[in-house]
């Protein structure tokens, strides 16, 4: 048996009750949490949606595009080991939104998972405007997801220091479908 798989076991027995360490350990084991979503991430200022632009390669830029609800506009809030922090994972390409930039206007990129210590791949979704919208803040840099002023489709998704403007405010909406007519 490999060293990482060794088990130590002990039992306490009293009449009608027997407790082993395997039983107790399962009480404290962390359960796998499922991602939340999928969501469309919509800019309050422009109505544009965060979009992969059909890219599937590590390091490509995220875009803002007219909302249509196709898989490349759907994002999951993946669990992390940090309270209040999530990974923003593309439902289309499984890449994470990466906020490694440190300058106002730097592009947001989609990257492979770098591990639990990659703070630039963790995000805080902070309620604003009475909970009707959110600011999406990078845990590593403190920069926020930003829609450039007067953006039209397609536009780059950028990072910016928080200033409270509507271009830094986002709605996470359930995907929608257009009803068939006929």
Please provide the spans of the model-predicted regions.
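Lectin-like carbohydrate-binding module/patch detector with strong preference for beta-trefoil
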Residues: 7-182
């Amino acid at each position: 048996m490999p060293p990482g798989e060794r088990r130590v076991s002990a039992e306490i027995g009293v009449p009608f009750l027997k407790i082993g360490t395997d039983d107790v350990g399962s009480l404290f084991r962390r359960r796998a949490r499922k991602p939340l979503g999928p969501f469309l991430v919509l800019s309050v200022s422009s109505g544009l949606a965060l979009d992969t632009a059909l890219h599937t390669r590590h390091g490509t830029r995220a875009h803002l595009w007219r909302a249509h609800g196709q898989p490349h506009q759907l994002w999951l809030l993946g669990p992390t080991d940090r309270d209040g922090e999530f990974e923003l994972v593309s439902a289309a390409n499984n890449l994470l939104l990466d906020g490694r930039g440190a300058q106002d206007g730097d592009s947001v990129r989609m990257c492979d998972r770098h591990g639990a210590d990659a703070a630039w791949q963790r995000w805080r979704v902070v309620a604003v405007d009475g909970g009707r919208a959110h600011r999406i803040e990078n845990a590593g840099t403190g920069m926020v997801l930003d829609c450039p002023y007067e953006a039209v489709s397609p536009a780059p998704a950028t990072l910016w220091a928080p200033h409270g403007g509507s271009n830094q405010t986002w709605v996470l909406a359930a995907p929608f479908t257009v009803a068939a007519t006929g």
